């Protein structure tokens, strides 16, 4: 099976696996324990925080580890909203966010917060004017993902930072699909989230960063771990492996960019010959991501045919694909249900070979030839 679903998850690299096994074997203590074994684990945790902080140019005091980016989104957004609710209860996001973000805002609506969904253009992008038109006197937080997992569109977060600072509004971003692959304006953010398994790290580990200068309130009371941000013993082997994955992604970024750009242009050239539509922004996008529609074919059909031919692709974000309903992002960008049903996603990585990619291109050509339907 040729794997082309890197936006859903990525394989752990050999280096990351080695780090995980080594730390799991040698540093198995509870970092909250007061004996030497616990101290060794705690020391690994603090070393990892410092290493990540150096790579991302953030304060290690604001780093918290969670069980996933989904959990990190919930805890970060809720903790910030609770801490600032006396100032206001108005929150802003978009309908193009990851399901974990959308469900978090639905939860906050049930807790008497008021949520506005800023409109996006046909590429899923937010304009400064649209955002400014949504801000109110009681707005306390804006959450906009840096890159959209279904469409692949990258948001120009830096253009929002200045007006949000002017109005003293917190700025959160889900950077799960971006960090390690493209540049992210982290210094413009008050908080961000990311995931281990999206950058060739382990599953079951996410990261939340909240600027230590920003007040937050624990979602659960009485929690002693990680300053009360998240309950439970920190998984030190996963933290170490996650750190190694971030480190590796930064070290190999130039080689990654060259490889991904080559495959990107190769596929885009071929697309010009096909009855195919690229969703999301044509240029300001993740280069390893293609959100596509083939005229006259359902995405589910394309995905199943690809699977039968030995290629793993998807019909959208894996966190919502089991619901068998179009992602709300399609309604947000003005697509009909029929158009949304045509969607499928191809995403590749550093391990994807040119030979594998050419084989997938040949598969799509054969599929289109069988259909024989003009644009």
Curated annotation (Swiss-Prot):
Disulfide bonds: none annotated. It is an enzyme of class 2 (transferase). It catalyses: (sulfur carrier)-H + L-cysteine = (sulfur carrier)-SH + L-alanine. Catalyzes the removal of elemental sulfur from cysteine to produce alanine. This is Putative cysteine desulfurase NifS. Its cofactor is pyridoxal 5'-phosphate. InterPro entries: Aminotrans_V_dom, Cysteine_dSase, PyrdxlP-dep_Trfase, PyrdxlP-dep_Trfase_major, PyrdxlP-dep_Trfase_small. The modification N6-(pyridoxal phosphate)lysine is found at residue 198. PANTHER family: CYSTEINE DESULFURASE NIFS-RELATED (PTHR11601:SF36), CYSTEINE DESULFURYLASE FAMILY MEMBER (PTHR11601). The keyword Transferase applies. Gene3D superfamilies: Aspartate Aminotransferase, domain 1, Type I PLP-dependent aspartate aminotransferase-like (Major domain). One of its GO terms (molecular function) is metal ion binding. Its EC number is 2.8.1.7. The gene is nifS. Belongs to the class-V pyridoxal-phosphate-dependent aminotransferase family. NifS/IscS subfamily. Keywords: Iron, Iron-sulfur, Metal-binding, Pyridoxal phosphate, Transferase. SUPFAM superfamilies: PLP-dependent transferases. The active site is at 319 (cysteine persulfide intermediate). It comes from the Bacteria. [2Fe-2S] cluster binds at residue 319. Pyridoxal 5'-phosphate binds at residues 69-70, 177, 195-197, 233. It comes from Halalkalibacterium halodurans (strain ATCC BAA-125 / DSM 18197 / FERM 7344 / JCM 9153 / C-125).
